[in-house]
C-alpha cells in the first residue's frame, strides 16, 4: 500500500474514532416518552395512564383529594395516574419528592403535593423485586383508573404552556414523560 493510501486509511480511522468519541461525550441517561409508553429508568418502569385536573366539588375527585384544602384562587390540582414496575431482581425504592416534578415549556415547575390518599403514589417507598405499584390488593389498583397518582398544584393557565412533562430522576438516571392534556 502506498504512503498516500496509508495516510487516507489512517485519516479515515482517526475521523471515525473522533466521531465516536464526540457522540459518547454527549450521551446522557435521559429519555423522553409520551403518556402511555413506559419510561425505563434503571430497573424501574414508569407508565403514565392518565393525566387530568381534579375538581374538589366532584364526588369521585373528592376521594382523591380527601384531607386537602381547596386550591387557592388561580391554581388547580393536576393528577398524574401511573403504575410503576420493578423489573429487577432486587428491591429498590421509588424516587423521593425532590426527584419528581412537572415542568411546562416556560420552565415553570411544580413539585408533588403531599397527600394521605389511598390512591396516591408514595414517593420514596420501597418496591420489591418484580413488584408493581399499585399492588393488586390496593384501592388504587381497584379504582376507576387502576393506577396510583401524583398530585401537583399548578397555575390555572398551565395548559397554555404545553406540553407539560413529568420529569423523574431515579437511581442516577433521568427521563421525562410528555403528559397528554
Q: Across the structure, where does each feature detected by a protein language model lie?
A:
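Conserved functional micro-motifs across diverse proteins
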Residues: 2-4, 18-21, 25-181
Amino acid at each position: 500500500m502506498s504512503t498516500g493510501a496509508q495516510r487516507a486509511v489512517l485519516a479515515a480511522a482517526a475521523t471515525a474514532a473522533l466521531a465516536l468519541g464526540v457522540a459518547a461525550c454527549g450521551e446522557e441517561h435521559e429519555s423522553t416518552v409520551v403518556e402511555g409508553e413506559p419510561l425505563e429508568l434503571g430497573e424501574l418502569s414508569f407508565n403514565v395512564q392518565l393525566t387530568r385536573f381534579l375538581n374538589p366539588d366532584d364526588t369521585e375527585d373528592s376521594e382523591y383529594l380527601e384531607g386537602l384544602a381547596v386550591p387557592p384562587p388561580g391554581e388547580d390540582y393536576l393528577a398524574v395516574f401511573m403504575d410503576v414496575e420493578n423489573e429487577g431482581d432486587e428491591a429498590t425504592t421509588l424516587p423521593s419528592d425532590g426527584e419528581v416534578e412537572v415542568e411546562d415549556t416556560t420552565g415553570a415547575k411544580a413539585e408533588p403535593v403531599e397527600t394521605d390518599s389511598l390512591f396516591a403514589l408514595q414517593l420514596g417507598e420501597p418496591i420489591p423485586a418484580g413488584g408493581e405499584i399499585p399492588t393488586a390488593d390496593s384501592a388504587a389498583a381497584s379504582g376507576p383508573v387502576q393506577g396510583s397518582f401524583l398530585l401537583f398544584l399548578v397555575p390555572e393557565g398551565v395548559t397554555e404552556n404545553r406540553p407539560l412533562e413529568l420529569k423523574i430522576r431515579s437511581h442516577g438516571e433521568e427521563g421525562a414523560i410528555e403528559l397528554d392534556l
